[in-house]
From Swiss-Prot:
InterPro entries: KOW (IPR005824), Rib_uL2_dom2 (IPR014722), Ribosomal_uL24 (IPR003256), Ribosomal_uL24_CS (IPR005825), Ribosomal_uL24_KOW (IPR041988), Translation_prot_SH3-like_sf (IPR008991). GO terms for cellular component: cytosolic large ribosomal subunit. Belongs to the universal ribosomal protein uL24 family. This is Large ribosomal subunit protein uL24. Part of the 50S ribosomal subunit. One of two assembly initiator proteins, it binds directly to the 5'-end of the 23S rRNA, where it nucleates assembly of the 50S subunit. One of the proteins that surrounds the polypeptide exit tunnel on the outside of the subunit. The keyword RNA-binding applies. Keywords: Ribonucleoprotein, Ribosomal protein, RNA-binding, rRNA-binding.
Length: 113
């Protein structure tokens, strides 16, 4: 029998809820969107307007009509980079201690995120 694959899950994510991110791979490559939700244990995020999937809903008490709904699905956080508003391009995230607090900075512009 083959060994089971070990899934890699990062200790922490480089993006937070509310960040503007740039998709670097996949079907939505070169698109930007706002992070709506973060799943750190799975290493995934949900981005507004990215990875839209069609979901078929059965009729229920909440939704008696049922039907077809389009919504955002989660993508791996490694597929996105933080989008720098100042340089209008994707950037890596760095960390610095300023005034006794650890802050995230943009590697391209040096600005605090």
């Amino acid at each position: 029998m083959a060994k089971p694959k070990i899934k890699f899950v990062p200790d922490s994510l480089h993006v937070k809820t509310g960040d503007i991110v740039y998709v670097i791979s996949g079907k939505d490559k070169k698109m930007t969107g706002k992070v709506l939700k973060v799943f750190p244990k799975k290493g995934k995020i949900i981005v507004e307007g990215i990875n839209i999937v069609t979901k078929h809903l059965k009729p229920s008490q909440v939704n008696p009509q049922g039907g077809v709904v389009q919504k955002e699905a989660a993508i791996f956080s490694s597929k996105v980079m933080l989008f720098d508003e100042k340089t209008k391009s994707p950037t890596r995230v760095g960390y610095e201690v300023r005034d006794g607090k650890k802050v995230r900075i943009s590697k391209k512009s040096g600005e605090i995120i």
